[in-house]
Amino acid sequence: MIEKLRTIRKNSLKEIPDLSEKDLNYPISYWIKEDRLLNERGKEFTIILRTRGCRWALGEQGGCSMCGYIRDSYIETLESHYIKNQFLNAWNAKIEEIEKDEFNFIIKIFNSGSFFDDEEINEDVRAFIYEKISQVDKIKEVVVESRVEFLNETNLKKMKEKLGNKHIEIAIGLETANDHIRINYLNKGLLYDDFLSVVQLIRKNQLGIRVYLLLKPPFLNERSAIDDCVASIKKMIGLKVNTISINPVNIQKGTLVDYLWKKKLYRPPWFYSLIKCLNSAITSQELLGYTRIVSDPSGAGTIRGIHNCNDKFCNDKMKEVVRNFVLTQDVNEIRYVEEQIECDCKLKYHIQNIYI
């Protein structure tokens, strides 16, 4: 599989367009929208920075089988002032709105790689970002993401020192608690024991842990995908991570999953499956007493993202259910949902779930 991943990645990198000076000074994207904070409804301010890209994706192993974010990267080393300008352009565009808003905020700084990889975002840039965030009281929570190999005590201590008045979460793409699936189907290059070691390191430095779980990795059918996701959610709740983010696969260009989908060997998960995962794993409201569970699926309702059928109403209803659950953290929002959906696709789903 690694050889196939390398070939797909190599061809995908050839399709990356040349970027202008303006492109390098502006982030890939940024936005504000409703989100769930630890103990309240609030809003998120998300900034996606353009860096040289994930080192794992650029390496000899070919990257993860489902991730195509490297296509948004610059590939070459990007000087610090470009990253600072990207952050500033997003920051300056939204900071007045944030300070005037009635809601509190969570800021998410993503770079489609690792925030603590110095080849993507160096210490000087990180300190610059911390300084800006620390000055805004409306921002109560901070999320950054990283592969485990770039997490160390020095980096975590510096972040804690600069942002000690905020709730900080380090997001890790564990994807599944099953080593076999993560290594052989996702090519993640991460063992569960390594994840546990980093969890201890993060907790030692009094920071929070956010775990990404993937719904329906390639080579799993719908039933197996549900079982894997439920088992992983339960394990993370037992581990008392601060946040679980469930990410149903969306088919990104230039990936092995995209290749399988085009060969009709893969279908994104059904919304019914996501609801089933949540109901099976969260058997009582008390389980959400410490861990919040969120899901904001990319491409939801499209053929490349999580969807039920081609009926817009059916998909929109399911998106609404998931969104209401995330914002309220009330398990009643996901109970008996399927019974309330009057759509012919339910029968097709159950037949496939049993026999395929």
Language model features with spans:
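Canonical Radical SAM [4Fe-4S] cluster-binding loop centered on the CxxxCxxC motif
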Residues: 30, 36-85
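Auxiliary Fe-S-binding modules of radical SAM enzymes
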Residues: 1-18, 26, 251-356
